[in-house]
């Protein structure tokens, strides 16, 4: 057997010795516990704090910090008998105001949190400290807030779950809808243009939907009259004709419309507003369709052509008149 196994370890049978918990205080020589029979006769027994032990206050003196640190570094033997603590002398602080038996090496004032507050040792209970912490985090309903109130008319109204445009007071349910509205109506920029007709849009999705207008495919057919459409939204609007549903009335003349956009365009006749302005000559129009037709004068684009003489026209109404007058077609 190797020699290392024959040598007795110094740590052997340590379980027979009294153990000291890591969280228990280290007793300096001044606080070395003494048996009960060696304590003075007038020493009070702190049965409420230590049922089986008492502490001796006779040798409790304030020592310099250097000597106290050296004494705390030493390991004192565990007490075998009860610990007796004598009454403090005159001039010392009473028991309620005296420091605890184990004094931490740090200060509670230096324990600052990330919220800019510092904790202080609560004199009574821990509940007051937790309550103070929660009030510092979430605020007290009894204390008026120093922050300004939200401007519900600016962007967002929590009570109504709506987003308001500050220029036209139009209401949107999502911030994305408000952003698109501002870019289309108030920014004056429509960066997405159609390569075929030159029509501009404020959003790429609108341009993608517009490209179906130039295609000949009509995949959305009405089941009532058989009319086909290129876009599903156009079919939905067409179905309102069969149901004779006109939920949007004009506030000036009472005329009703199938769509809200048609009603809004109609109100421009009464108000005289012309929000659609030509970027080339500055001429303004009340309808966006009129601006599109006007822009073809500057670009020379003629999307409507006669199948008999291949003559092109900028407006569809001009093509119909040409067929009636030149080719006697209706």
Curated annotation (Swiss-Prot):
- The annotated region (Disordered) lies at 1-42
Stretches assigned to coiled coil: none
Q: What is its main location?
A: nucleus
Q: Which residues carry this modification: N6,N6-dimethyllysine?
A: 8
Please provide the record's keywords in A-Z order: Activator, Chromatin regulator, Developmental protein, DNA-binding, Metal-binding, Methylation, Nucleus, Proto-oncogene, Repeat, Repressor, Transcription, Transcription regulation, Zinc, Zinc-finger
Induction per the UniProt record: By GATA1 which binds to GFI1B promoter in cooperation with the transcription factor NFYA. Target gene of transcription factor E2-alpha/TCF3 that promotes growth arrest and apoptosis in lymphomas.
Stored InterPro entries: Znf_C2H2_sf, Znf_C2H2_type
Highest taxon of source: Eukaryota
Q: Where are the transmembrane segments?
A: none
Q: Tell me the segments the record calls region Interaction with ARIH2.
A: 91-330
Q: Which GO terms describe its cellular component?
A: nuclear matrix; nucleoplasm; nucleus; plasma membrane; transcription regulator complex
Q: Where in the cell is it found?
A: Nucleus
Locate the region SNAG domain.
1-20
Q: How is it modified after translation?
A: Methylation at Lys-8 in the SNAG domain seems required for the recruitment of the corepressor complex.
Tell me the tissue specificity.
Answer: Expressed in bone marrow and fetal liver, but also detectable in fetal spleen, fetal thymus, and testes. Detected in hematopoietic stem cells, erythroblasts, and megakaryocytes. Overexpressed in bone marrow of patients with erythroleukemia and megakaryocytic leukemia as well as in their corresponding leukemic cell lines, and markedly repressed in severe aplastic anemia (SAA).
Region annotation (Mediates interaction with GATA1) ranges: 164-330
Give the UniProt record's GO annotations in the biological process aspect.
chromatin organization; negative regulation of G1/S transition of mitotic cell cycle; negative regulation of transcription by RNA polymerase II; regulation of hemopoiesis; regulation of transcription by RNA polymerase II
**Pfam families in the cross-refs:** zf-C2H2
Q: What does this protein do?
A: Essential proto-oncogenic transcriptional regulator necessary for development and differentiation of erythroid and megakaryocytic lineages. Component of a RCOR-GFI-KDM1A-HDAC complex that suppresses, via histone deacetylase (HDAC) recruitment, a number of genes implicated in multilineage blood cell development and controls hematopoietic differentiation. Transcriptional repressor or activator depending on both promoter and cell type context; represses promoter activity of SOCS1 and SOCS3 and thus, may regulate cytokine signaling pathways.
Q: What is known of its domains?
A: The zinc finger domains are essential for erythroid expansion and acts as an activation domain whereas non finger domain serves as repression domain.
Q: Which disease is it linked to?
A: Bleeding disorder, platelet-type, 17: An autosomal dominant disorder characterized by increased bleeding tendency due to platelet dysfunction, and associated with macrothrombocytopenia and red cell anisopoikilocytosis. Platelets appear abnormal on light microscopy, while electron microscopy shows a heterogeneous decrease of alpha granules within platelets. Bone marrow biopsy shows increased numbers of abnormal megakaryocytes, suggesting a defect in megakaryopoiesis and platelet production.
Which PANTHER family would you find in this protein's record? Answer: FI21258P1-RELATED (PTHR23226:SF419), ZINC FINGER AND SCAN DOMAIN-CONTAINING (PTHR23226)
The entry's protein name is: Zinc finger protein Gfi-1b
Q: Which organism is it from?
A: Homo sapiens (Human)
Source organism phylogeny? Eukaryota, Metazoa, Chordata, Craniata, Vertebrata
């Amino acid at each position: 057997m190797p020699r290392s196994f024959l040598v007795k370890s110094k740590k052997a049978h340590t379980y027979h010795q009294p153990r000291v918990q890591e969280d228990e205080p280290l007793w300096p020589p001044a606080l070395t516990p003494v048996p009960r029979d060696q304590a003075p006769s007038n020493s009070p027994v702190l049965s409420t704090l230590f049922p089986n032990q008492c502490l001796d206050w006779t040798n409790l003196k304030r020592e310099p910090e250097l000597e106290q640190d050296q004494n705390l570094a030493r390991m004192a033997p565990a007490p075998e008998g009860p610990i007796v603590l004598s009454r403090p002398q005159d001039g010392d602080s009473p028991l309620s105001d005296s420091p605890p038996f184990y004094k931490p090496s740090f200060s509670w004032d230096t324990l600052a949190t990330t919220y800019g507050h510092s904790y202080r040792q609560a004199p009574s209970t821990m509940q007051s400290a937790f309550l103070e912490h929660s009030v510092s985090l979430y605020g007290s309903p009894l204390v008026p807030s120093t922050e300004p109130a939200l401007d519900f008319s600016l962007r967002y109204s929590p009570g109504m779950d709506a987003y308001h445009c500050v220029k036209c007071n139009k209401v949107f349910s999502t911030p994305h809808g408000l952003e698109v509205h501002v870019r289309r109506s108030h920014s004056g920029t429509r960066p997405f243009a159609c390569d075929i007709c030159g029509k501009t849009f404020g959003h790429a999705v609108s341009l993608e939907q517009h490209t179906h207008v130039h295609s000949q495919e009509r995949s959305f057919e009405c089941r009532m009259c058989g009319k086909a459409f290129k876009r599903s939204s156009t079919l939905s609007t067409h179905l309102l004709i069969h149901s004779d549903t006109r939920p949007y009335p004009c506030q000036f003349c009472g005329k009703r419309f199938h769509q809200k956009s048609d009603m809004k365009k109609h109100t421009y006749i009464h108000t005289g507003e012309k929000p659609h302005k030509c970027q080339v000559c500055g001429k303004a129009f009340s309808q966006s369709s009129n601006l599109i037709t006007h822009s073809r004068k500057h670009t020379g684009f003629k999307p409507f052509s006669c199948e008999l003489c291949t003559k092109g026209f900028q407006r569809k109404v001009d093509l119909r008149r040409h067929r009636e007058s030149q080719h006697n077609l209706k």
